[in-house]
C-alpha cells in the first residue's frame, strides 16, 4: 500500500491527505508477539509436567485385548450407541510424541482460511465502492486508501488473542495443580471423548473407607479375618486394600494368595492353603453358604453409607464385616463437569460392595451418566507403562487429570464463542468503513483509531474467556 502511494503521491491533488496506518500495523505485530509469548509460556508449562521424574497419570484411548478392556468397550458401546471416543486413565514414566503434539496445528486454525480472504474481499469491495458510489465521489487514491483502511479494520487481529489466551489461561490453571494439555492438537483429540473410566479409589479414597465392625463365627479370630481380607484385596487393589493395609501396618508377612474367581459380587481365593470366599450375601448363597442374619442387611445398607460383606473359610461362614464408604467430596463436582462436557463415566472396581445400586445411594447417578465396571483380571492392575503417547497428563492426581480433560471442551467452546465475536467485529468494521467512505471522511480516519477499534474487541473476548474457563 505505502509503496504504491509513494509512486502516485506526486500525481495527487495538493490537498490530498494520505494515511499510512502504520500504528495499526505495529499494533498487529504487537498482538502477534503477545500471541507467541503466551504460546511459548504454555509450552513451558507442558514441558515441565511431561519432564517430571514422577510417574504421570495420562488420558489414554481405551485399547487392548485383555478381558476387562473388552468388557469395558462393550459396556460403553451399549451405553453410547457406538459413538465417540472412549478413554481411560493409565500411568506412564515417559511421555512420547511431545514435540509432535506441540507442533501440530489444530482444526480451528482453518477458520483463518476464510477470515483473511474475507478481509481482503472487504477491502476490494470498499475500493470499488469508493470509486463507483454516488455518495462518496472520491478519486482513485482516496478509494484505494479506503480499501486499505477497510482491510486494517476487519483483519482478524483479535483472533490471535482468541487462539492463545483461552488455552494459556486453562494451561496456567492446570499447571498450578500439576497437570497439562500438550499442544493445541490435543484439544481436538480429547474433546471428542464420550466416555472415560478410572479406578474406584478415586471415588472412595483410603481415608473415606472404614471397617466399622467385624462379627466372627466359630474359631475365626478378628485378626485372622483381617489377615485373609487384606491378602485378597492386596491382590486386587482398591479402597479396601488401602483401608486394610493401614490396619495391618507393621504386621506384614509373606503369604501365598491365588485368586480363583473374581465375580461381580464376590471373590474366590486360596490364602496360605485355606479356601476363602469373600463377598456379598448373594455370592455366599450361590456357593452354598448361609450368611449371618441376611435379613438385617437391607436395613443396614438402606442408610446409604454402610455395606455388609461376608467371609467364608473352608466352606464355613467365618465373619460378617460392616464397611463404611464415604464418597470423595470433589467426585460429584468432577462428575457434573464431565457430564456437561458430554462424557459418560465408568468406575473400575474389584470390590464386591461397589455396584450401581450402592453408588446411586451416594451420588445422584440418575442426573449423571455413570456406570460401575466390574473387573475380572488383575494383570494390568497398577501397571506403569515405560512409554506412553498422551496429550493430557498429570504428575499429581487423577482428579487433577480429569480437570485438564474438562478444560479441553471449555477451551474449544470459548474459541468458538470468540470466533463469533470476531466475525461480528469484522461486520462492524466493514460497516464503519463504508460509512466513513460515504461521508468522504476517509482522510480523517487515523491509524490510532483503527488500532483502538481492533483492541476494543479484546475486552469482550477476555470476558468470555474468564467466564467460560
Model region roles, listed by residue range:
Residues 187-213:
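Asp-based phosphoryl-transfer active-site loop
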Residues 212-214, 219, 325-327:
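A short acidic/small-residue loop/turn micro-motif
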Residues 199-201, 280-281, 322-326, 348-354, ...:
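Structural motif
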Residues 1-65, 70-195, 392-469:
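Hydrophobic alpha-helical transmembrane segments
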Residues 351-373:
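Substrate-recognition/cap helix-loop segment adjacent to the acidic, metal-dependent catalytic center
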Residues 248-359:
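Signature of the cytosolic headpiece of P-type E1-E2 ATPases
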Amino acid at each position: 500500500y505505502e509503496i504504491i502511494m509513494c509512486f502516485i503521491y506526486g500525481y495527487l491533488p495538493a490537498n490530498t491527505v494520505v494515511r499510512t496506518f502504520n500504528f495499526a500495523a505495529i499494533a498487529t505485530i504487537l498482538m502477534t508477539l503477545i500471541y507467541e509469548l503466551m504460546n511459548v509460556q504454555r509450552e513451558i508449562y507442558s514441558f515441565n509436567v511431561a519432564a517430571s521424574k514422577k510417574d504421570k497419570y495420562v488420558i489414554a484411548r481405551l485399547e487392548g485385548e485383555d478381558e476387562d478392556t473388552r468388557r469395558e468397550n462393550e459396556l460403553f458401546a451399549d451405553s453410547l450407541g457406538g459413538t465417540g471416543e472412549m478413554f481411560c486413565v493409565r500411568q506412564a514414566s515417559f511421555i512420547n510424541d511431545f514435540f509432535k503434539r506441540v507442533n501440530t496445528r489444530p482444526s480451528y486454525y482453518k477458520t483463518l482460511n476464510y477470515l483473511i480472504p474475507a478481509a481482503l474481499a472487504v477491502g476490494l469491495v470498499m475500493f470499488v465502492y469508493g470509486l463507483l458510489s454516488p455518495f462518496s465521489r472520491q478519486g482513485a487514491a482516496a478509494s484505494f486508501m479506503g480499501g486499505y483502511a477497510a482491510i486494517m479494520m476487519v483483519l482478524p487481529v483479535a483472533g490471535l488473542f482468541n487462539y492463545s489466551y483461552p488455552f494459556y489461561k486453562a494451561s496456567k490453571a492446570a499447571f498450578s495443580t500439576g497437570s497439562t494439555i500438550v499442544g493445541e492438537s490435543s484439544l481436538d483429540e480429547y474433546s471428542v471423548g464420550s466416555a472415560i473410566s478410572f479406578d474406584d479409589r478415586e471415588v472412595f479414597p483410603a481415608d473415606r473407607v472404614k471397617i466399622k465392625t467385624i462379627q466372627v463365627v466359630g474359631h475365626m479370630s478378628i485378626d485372622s479375618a483381617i489377615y485373609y481380607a487384606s491378602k485378597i484385596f492386596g491382590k486386587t487393589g482398591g479402597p479396601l486394600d488401602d483401608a486394610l493395609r493401614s490396619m495391618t501396618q507393621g504386621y506384614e508377612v509373606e503369604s501365598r494368595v491365588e485368586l480363583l474367581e473374581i465375580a461381580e459380587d464376590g471373590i474366590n481365593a486360596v490364602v496360605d492353603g485355606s479356601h476363602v470366599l469373600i463377598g456379598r450375601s448373594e455370592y455366599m448363597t450361590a456357593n452354598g453358604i448361609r450368611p449371618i442374619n441376611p435379613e438385617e442387611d437391607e436395613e443396614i445398607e438402606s442408610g446409604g453409607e454402610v455395606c455388609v460383606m461376608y467371609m467364608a473359610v473352608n466352606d464355613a461362614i467365618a465373619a460378617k464385616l460392616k464397611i463404611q464408604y464415604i464418597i470423595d467430596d470433589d467426585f460429584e463436582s468432577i462428575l457434573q463437569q464431565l457430564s456437561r462436557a458430554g462424557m459418560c463415566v465408568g468406575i473400575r472396581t474389584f470390590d464386591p460392595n461397589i455396584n450401581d445400586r450402592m453408588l446411586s445411594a451416594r451420588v445422584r447417578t440418575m442426573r449423571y451418566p455413570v456406570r460401575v465396571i466390574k473387573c475380572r483380571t488383575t494383570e494390568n492392575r497398577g501397571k506403569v507403562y515405560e512409554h506412553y503417547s498422551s496429550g493430557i497428563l498429570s504428575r499429581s492426581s487423577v482428579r487433577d487429570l480429569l480437570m485438564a480433560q474438562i478444560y479441553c471442551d471449555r477451551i474449544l467452546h470459548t474459541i468458538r464463542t470468540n470466533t463469533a465475536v470476531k466475525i461480528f467485529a469484522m461486520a462492524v468494521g466493514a460497516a464503519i468503513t463504508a460509512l466513513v467512505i460515504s461521508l468522504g471522511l476517509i482522510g480523517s480516519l487515523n491509524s490510532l483509531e483503527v488500532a483502538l477499534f481492533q483492541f476494543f474487541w479484546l475486552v469482550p473476548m477476555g470476558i468470555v474467556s474468564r467466564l467460560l474457563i
